[in-house]
């Protein structure tokens, strides 16, 4: 008889029996659960490993609260705040009569937290607190206090009335609560603006340099705007300068207006203009003609402008405009003379051709 094979067979049978028993036990447990819940399926969740203390720390969003690990003497339910003397516990243990008086005062004031009653006491003793000597700041705690002083503005100021924050005293709220709260917010905003300005400037030299750079940049921007406006007022548009078509003589040019009417009417005082600049601007609509005609037109305009500037001394631009303007009679006379000269030239050329 083989003992090894018999042992293996018994192990397999024993293993099958144990698996069957485990299944039966599980089925019995499910039946009892279904009967206990009256036919409703219940899903059991595994308990979370996160403790209530850690969840409370996650809910805390105040940056002024400092959490200290157990290695440095901290506790799970205790949090610390940064003061001039270092980190201090937020919770303070009171004696029995002091705690009773504090809770009685809380009930009489009608506030929901004991800390608000303490705030009321601090505000009531404001004058006595101001008479006390200030606390000296140690060098090792100065850096910590300077780091957290931006977060201290989020809380209540030392001389602030609890009634200004909307607390109910004896079950009623005063009418001046809203106005005083708005005034406090406005003053707080002004203080924050002053603090940020002082923080970013740093020193008087830096502030002076920034101010000088700002004025210099502003002066450059104003100068650039003035030059662009001056160029815009000097450059004539095609609708403002009308050039007649060239018939026989290239110098027969009629100018309706040389300057925009809006520039003289809009600006009360206009500076004197250089005739050379005006001639250079008048070359723009005349670039399509020949070089001889453009040079003659430019010379004619320059002579007119130069004569008007020499007679008037360049004092008033209205006189210059009136001297440049042509009347309709003069333009028609010039056109007739040009046509007459053109006809004479044509007849003389015809006679020479016949000869």
Swiss-Prot record:
Biased composition (Basic and acidic residues): 341-355
Major subcellular site: nucleus
Tissue specificity of this protein: Expressed in cotyledons, particularly in the vascular region, in leaves, buds, flowers and immature siliques, and, to a lower extent, in roots.
The keyword Nucleus is assigned to this record: yes
Alphabetized Pfam families for the sequence: TCP
Cellular compartments per GO CC: chloroplast; nucleus
Localization (cell): Nucleus; Plastid, Chloroplast
Subunit (UniProt): Interacts with AHL27 and AHL29. Interacts with SPL. Interacts with KIN10; KIN11 and FLZ3.
Protein name: Transcription factor TCP13
Source species: Arabidopsis thaliana
């Amino acid at each position: 008889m083989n003992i090894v094979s018999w042992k293996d067979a018994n192990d397999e049978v024993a293993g099958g029996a144990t698996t069957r028993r485990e299944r039966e036990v599980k089925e019995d447990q499910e039946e009892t659960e279904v009967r206990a819940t009256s036919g409703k399926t219940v899903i059991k969740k595994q308990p979370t490993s996160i403790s209530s203390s850690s969840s409370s720390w996650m809910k805390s969003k105040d940056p002024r609260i400092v959490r200290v690990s157990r290695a440095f003497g901290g506790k799970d339910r205790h949090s610390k705040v940064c003061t001039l003397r270092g980190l201090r516990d937020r919770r303070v243990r009171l004696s029995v009569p002091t705690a009773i008086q504090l809770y009685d005062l809380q009930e009489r004031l009608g506030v929901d937290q004991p800390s608000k009653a303490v705030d009321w006491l601090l505000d009531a003793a404001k004058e006595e607190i101001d008479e006390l000597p200030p606390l000296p700041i140690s060098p090792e705690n100065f850096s910590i206090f300077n780091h957290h002083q931006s977060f201290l503005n989020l809380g209540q100021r030392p001389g602030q009335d609890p009634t200004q924050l909307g607390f109910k005293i004896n079950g009623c709220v005063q009418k001046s609560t809203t106005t005083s709260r708005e005034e406090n917010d406005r003053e707080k905003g002004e203080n924050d603006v002053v603090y940020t300005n002082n923080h970013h400037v740093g020193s008087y030299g830096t502030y002076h340099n920034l101010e000088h750079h700002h004025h210099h940049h502003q002066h450059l921007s104003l100068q650039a705007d003035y030059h662009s406006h001056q160029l815009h007022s000097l450059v004539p548009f095609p609708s403002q300068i009308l050039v007649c078509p060239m018939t026989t003589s290239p110098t027969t040019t009629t100018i309706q207006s040389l300057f925009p009417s809006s520039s003289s009417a809009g600006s009360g005082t206009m500076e004197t203009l250089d005739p050379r600049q005006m001639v250079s601007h008048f070359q723009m609509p005349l670039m399509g003609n020949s070089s001889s005609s453009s040079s003659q037109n430019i010379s004619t305009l320059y002579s007119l402008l130069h004569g008007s500037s020499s007679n008037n001394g360049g004092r008033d631009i209205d006189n210059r405009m009136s001297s440049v303007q042509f009347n309709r009679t003069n333009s028609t006379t010039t056109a007739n003379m040009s046509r007459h000269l053109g006809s004479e030239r044509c007849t003389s050329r015809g006679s020479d051709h016949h000869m």
